[in-house]
Amino acid sequence: MFLSTFEKQLDSKRRIVVPQEFRAAVSGPFDGIFCFPSIEADCLEAGGKALFDRYQAVIEEMPFGDPTRTALETSILGGMAKLTFDTAGRITLPDHLCDMFGLTDSVAVVGMGERFQIWSREAFQAHRAQQRDLAREGLAALRAQQRAAKFAGGAA
């Protein structure tokens, strides 16, 4: 499981040290990660074989030729890079993926359970603030629904 947020440096060869905890989470026959442009945000998404298998299963449930399936195949499978760890625990991000999201020197590696994201530090700071606001609003709405359900159940 990928947890926490780490600030890392991207070197001149576009290498980044993947946190040890993240490397341990993807250990297996393939010593590396799958990385692709996120379809949810302006960042890279990455994970191990389990994440790849999950996306593949979602895609394969859709009929061949379905526009959504094609969009997912193009965005995820077509944009995916299979990156192996070097002896220092680094991966080398492809130029086109770095250029897509302005990844230059300082990046945030953000754990999200079964996956993680790689952001430019500045973009992540803005995104994190937006996500905190959405989380507060969502939690308040959920609590209101729970109170309403409890009240409705008690009134019967």
Curated annotation (Swiss-Prot):
The keyword tRNA processing does not apply. HAMAP family: MraZ. It is found in: Cytoplasm, Nucleoid. Keywords: Cytoplasm, DNA-binding, Repeat, Transcription, Transcription regulation. SUPFAM superfamilies: AbrB/MazE/MraZ-like. One of its GO terms (cellular component) is nucleoid. One of its GO terms (molecular function) is DNA-binding transcription factor activity. Forms oligomers. PANTHER family: TRANSCRIPTIONAL REGULATOR MRAZ (PTHR34701:SF1). GO terms for biological process: negative regulation of DNA-templated transcription initiation. Transmembrane segments: none annotated. Belongs to the MraZ family. The lineage of its organism: Bacteria, Pseudomonadati, Pseudomonadota, Alphaproteobacteria, Caulobacterales. Residues 5-51, 80-123 form the SpoVT-AbrB domain. This is Transcriptional regulator MraZ.
